[in-house]
């Protein structure tokens, strides 16, 4: 397994729309393993392949405190099941150190393939619903900062660019 490099906003590669996975093979399973290792090391609770510069529709997630609930979503799709919205303070491994409130549908149906390529479906609410929507946004080239006002988004962008310049 390997720790992968996580792209950071405003890297334009984060805007790439990921392509569907045609076949879940050993290469995809290795990507899943590497993504879990990267996510746990970061540490985070979710990671989309786009964030590690692999533009395939793959998401890993683990909302548990003890890394006991790893979830894999290959070619995930979600459908809101309610008009009710929840507001969560979201953060992102690609926007390190920043947290902002984002409104998202409270309940969603998720369809995806598992690590073995088997289709499954689940109904998600709360944090799981928020996370799958957040990670699917990554696969579509969208970040949580896109839900913010342009003023807030520009402020975050400038702060991160300054940090990147100082690290160079």
From Swiss-Prot:
It is an enzyme of class 3 (hydrolase). It catalyses: N-terminal N-formyl-L-methionyl-[peptide] + H2O = N-terminal L-methionyl-[peptide] + formate. Its EC number is 3.5.1.88. The active site is at residue 135. Keywords: Hydrolase, Iron, Metal-binding, Protein biosynthesis. One of its GO terms (molecular function) is peptide deformylase activity. GO terms for biological process: co-translational protein modification; translation. Fe cation binds at residues 92, 134, 138. InterPro entries: Peptide_deformylase (IPR023635), Peptide_deformylase_sf (IPR036821). Pfam families: Pep_deformylase (PF01327). It comes from the Bacteria. Binds 1 Fe(2+) ion. Its cofactor is Fe(2+). Removes the formyl group from the N-terminal Met of newly synthesized proteins. Requires at least a dipeptide for an efficient rate of reaction. N-terminal L-methionine is a prerequisite for activity but the enzyme has broad specificity at other positions. Belongs to the polypeptide deformylase family. PANTHER family: PEPTIDE DEFORMYLASE (PTHR10458:SF21). This is Peptide deformylase. It comes from Stutzerimonas stutzeri (strain A1501). The gene is def.
């Amino acid at each position: 397994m390997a720790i992968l490099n996580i792209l950071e906003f405003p890297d334009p590669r984060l805007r790439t729309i990921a392509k569907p996975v045609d076949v879940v093979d050993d290469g995809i399973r290795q990507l899943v393993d590497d993504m879990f290792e990267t996510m746990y090391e970061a540490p985070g609770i979710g990671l989309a392949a786009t964030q590690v510069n692999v533009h395939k529709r793959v998401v890993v997630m683990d909302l548990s405190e003890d890394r006991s609930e790893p979830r894999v979503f290959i070619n995930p799709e979600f459908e809101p099941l309610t008009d009710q919205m929840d507001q969560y303070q979201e953060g992102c491994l690609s926007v390190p150190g920043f947290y902002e409130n984002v409104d998202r549908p409270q309940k969603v149906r998720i369809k995806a393939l598992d690590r073995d390529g088997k289709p499954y479906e689940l109904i998600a609410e709360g944090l799981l619903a928020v996370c799958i929507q957040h990670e699917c946004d990554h696969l579509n080239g969208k970040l949580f900062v896109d839900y913010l006002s342009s003023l807030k988004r520009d402020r975050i962008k400038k702060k991160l660019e300054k940090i990147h310049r100082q690290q160079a």
